[in-house]
Every structure is written in structure tokens, then in C-alpha cells.
């Protein structure tokens, strides 16, 4: 009887060990499948992060991608110039030379006829170059926080000769700088450090937000993007709400959302290069009237970080913050490496394997 019982006990113990081993293997496998949700207000750099993942973790852009982005570069460039020209009368800025009026008319005509995605004609290229060199246009550009303008405007308009060449082909950096509004959900899959990543980018504009929250309650982590440089700008959607205040509000609603109680949150304070330039001449008090610090990058950036971290109401949830420049591949590679290490540690801890 004793022998029979010990045989049963041994069999039960063996079964128990097998179940535990299977559970552990399942846990390890589950810990290898990483779902990341990329969130943030419109134009915070989410789509650029997705493009960087293609460059860093996939085989980069295809020949077809380069071909498809060529008209986008043309359109982004001419539409940026149009945005500046349209703002001039609103800001009571004159051209330094009256002849620029006819150049501006040519640029407006091209956009009106919806030819903005086509290569620049020689006449159009010459007109755009004259306009961009005009002192009045440059003055209006320097006040771009007072109207809506793509971040990449200067990047493209400073390089009109290259973009206007007959044999122009976009570079990787050109593609990273392009702006196309994201609608719906963009999904990217890649492997890194023996993990299988699924990255979801969701349209940032207000009208899109209600579509995603409940669908992603099982994500491993949220990467929340904030454009640091937008502290002195207002929204496209209503032109009265400060963009950074809107970002803070959205971060609050995500960070403390019931669906994401146990979800790691990684905060990308993005566009640090533009912020570093801007903070010298545009005070942070535009967004945070109570700020008493200096007009200096380190102090101002730390203050912005503290405002976002203060929104976290959970004592058990940590916010992992990084200052980023989404158009800088080396910077994003370095930051994503650090992010992955945090995810690995958290995931293994969650499975009881760390």
C-alpha cells in the first residue's frame, strides 16, 4: 500500500513538475512577445519613430518607398512655403521686394491646381528660391509659432536646389522629415534582442483618439510621444489650446486609464533639437506661467519632464523618460535599446522569472 501510494505521489509530482515547466516555457514565450502602443498628440513624432524602426530593425526603405515619398517631399516643401506666405498678411509682414508678389502668385496657382506633388518646373523653383531668400518671408518664418507650419519647412526649403534637380531621389533623412497625417492604425513587426515586437501607431488627431483605448489593454508598454518644441504653439483643431497643455491632458488620461493600470509607460520628450533652439528666444512661461527657471535647455527640459511625471497618480507605476530626436537614427537606436532592456526586466519580473 505504502509503495503504491509513493508511486502515485511520484507520478503526481512528475506531472506537477511537467506542468510547472510548461508554464515556465509559456511564460518565457509570452515574455518574448512584445506589444507596444505608440501614443501622443498629433505631430509629436510617432510616425517618424515607426519609420526609424523600419530603418533600424528591418531592412530600411524599399525602392518603392523611395519612389512613393518623392511626391510627398515636393508637396511638403511647397505647402510649407504656402503656409508662410499665407501668414504674412495676418502678421502684417511685407515682402522686402514687391516683385515677390508675382512669385507668390505662381506658388499659390500650383497648389490651387493641385500640382503640388509634381517635380518643380524651372520657373517655379526659381520663384520658390527668391521667396525663401526674401527678408519678409524669413521674418514670417521666424514667427512660425504664431501659425501652423511643418517642423521640416526649413530642412526642405534650405535645400531647394537638390530637391529641384531633374534626377532628385529622396534620401532616408528626407523620408524621415516628411509629414503625412496618420489615420487609422499602422502596425510594424520586427525582432530585436530575441524578442518579437509589434508596434502600433494610432492617428494622433483628436477625432481619432476614441477609436483605440479599449482595443489595447493587453499591450506590454506604451510609448507616449510629446513634442517638447510645441510649448509655445496652439492646436490645428481649435487654435486656442496650447499644444503642450493638450499633451499633458492626453498623458493624464492615458497614464491613469483603467485599461492601462499595470502597463509600463515610456515617455519620449521628442524634438529636443528644436526645443534647444527655441527655448533661447521663446519663454517657457507661455505654457507654464508659474515657471521661474532660466531660458536654458537642461533646466527647462527637466521642468517639462516633472510636469508630465506629476500626472502619474499610481505609486506603483514608474514613468521611464527619454529626451529624443526622432529624426536622428543613432539617438533613437540608443534610446530604443534602453527601452528594450526595461521591457525585458519588467516582463520577466511579471512572469516571476527575474
Swiss-Prot record:
Protein residues bound to GTP: 40-47, 176-182, 201-205, 270-273, 326
GO CC terms in record: cytoplasm; heterotrimeric G-protein complex; plasma membrane
Coiled-coil blocks: none
Record region (G1 motif): 35-48
InterPro entries linked to this entry: Gprotein_alpha_I (IPR001408), Gprotein_alpha_su (IPR001019), GproteinA_insert (IPR011025), P-loop_NTPase (IPR027417)
Domain of life: Eukaryota
Organism: Drosophila melanogaster
Family assignment from sequence similarity: Belongs to the G-alpha family. G(i/o/t/z) subfamily.
Subunit-level organization: G proteins are composed of 3 units; alpha, beta and gamma. The alpha chain contains the guanine nucleotide binding site.
Distribution of this protein across tissues and organs: Expressed primarily in neuronal cell bodies in the brain, optic lobe, and thoracic and abdominal ganglia. Also expressed in antenna, oocytes and ovarian nurse cells.
Chain ranges of the G-alpha domain: 32-354
A single MF term (Gene Ontology): GTPase activity
S-palmitoyl cysteine lipid sites: 3
Ranges for region G3 motif: 197-206
PANTHER family to which the protein is assigned, alphabetical: G PROTEIN ALPHA O SUBUNIT (PTHR10218:SF362), GTP-BINDING PROTEIN ALPHA SUBUNIT (PTHR10218)
Classification via Pfam families: G-alpha
Chain residue ranges for the region called G5 motif: 324-329
Binding positions for Mg(2+) per the UniProt entry: 47, 182
Keywords, in A-Z order: GTP-binding, Lipoprotein, Magnesium, Metal-binding, Myristate, Nucleotide-binding, Palmitate, Transducer
Gene3D superfamilies given in the database record: GI Alpha 1, domain 2-like, P-loop containing nucleotide triphosphate hydrolases
Residue positions bearing lipid (N-myristoyl glycine): 2
Protein name per Swiss-Prot or TrEMBL: G protein alpha o subunit
Record flagged with keyword Magnesium: yes
